[in-house]
């Protein structure tokens, strides 16, 4: 990709994007066993190969696969944090600077059907991920690491709760899920077409999925306010509750050796 951009004459410093390299996800979905050393080598080589793409995030944490398997909000968040922390450890052990390691990681998370719970999940995630990244300071918490501590999230509407019967009802589910993610301030949203559970999405269903986001942006103006949930007693309290439960589960995972 770097060579291609070079041949095309692009300035790689001006390019923004992501590459979803995630060996742990492949193991979860395909059952192929990889050693910790193999995973660490894969992601470290990916980050080093993409060093010219300074605004690219090349390592993915795909907890969306857990969401699509029925994981609840705090559970998905806990495993996503443990997943990300594992990659942070692998990268820093491979000699990648802490802030570069944090900047390389992108979270691909699912959006469940519990409207307020999902808003709280993403808000809690930003807080807890910053706490984890801060633990990698060596020997001081530099400005670069502080800036890199912001959780980058791509959210995808869940497939777990979609029905094949009266599939247009899925539009209601995906619309409220999209609203949850937008209010929570994620960086990117993917709306699953309403017919994706039983057929290859059609041109019509894909167009509707795109328009669902445009409605929230252009007509509801969901892109105009930063953290619109801030100050709401209910959402602030729910965010704290989700954060506490997710952190408890995260620590339990770490006590058992982390994702490996």
Regions found by a protein language model. Name each.
Residues 85, 92, 124-144, 170-188, ...:
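Long amphipathic alpha-helical segments
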Residues 71-77, 112-124, 158-171, 199-209, ...:
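Short glycine/threonine-rich loop-to-helix capping motif typified by GTGT followed
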């Amino acid at each position: 990709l770097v060579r291609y951009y070079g041949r095309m004459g692009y300035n790689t410093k001006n390019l923004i994007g992501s590459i979803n390299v995630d060996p742990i996800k492949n193991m979860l979905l395909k059952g192929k066993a990889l050693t910790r050393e193999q995973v660490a080598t894969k992601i470290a080589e990916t980050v080093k190969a993409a060093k010219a793409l300074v605004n690219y995030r090349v390592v993915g944490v795909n907890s969306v696969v857990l969401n699509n398997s029925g994981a609840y909000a705090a559970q998905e968040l806990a495993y996503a944090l443990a997943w990300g922390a594992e990659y942070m450890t692998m990268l820093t052990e491979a000699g990648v600077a802490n802030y570069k390691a944090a900047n390389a990681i992108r979270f691909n998370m699912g959006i469940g059907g519990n409207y307020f719970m999902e808003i709280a999940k993403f808000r809690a995630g930003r807080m807890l991920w910053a706490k984890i990244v801060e633990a990698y300071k060596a020997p001081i918490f530099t400005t670069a690491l502080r800036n890199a501590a912001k959780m980058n999230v791509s959210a995808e509407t869940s497939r777990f709760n979609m029905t094949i019967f009266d599939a247009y009802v899925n539009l209601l589910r995906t619309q409220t899920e999209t609203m949850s993610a937008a209010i929570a301030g994620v960086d990117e949203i993917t709306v699953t077409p309403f017919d994706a559970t039983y057929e290859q999405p059609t041109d019509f269903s894909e167009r509707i999925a795109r328009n669902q986001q445009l409605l929230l942006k252009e007509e509801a103006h969901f892109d105009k306010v930063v953290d619109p949930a801030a100050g709401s007693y209910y959402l602030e309290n729910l965010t704290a509750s989700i954060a506490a439960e997710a952190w408890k589960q995260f620590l339990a995972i770490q006590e058992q050796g982390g994702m490996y």
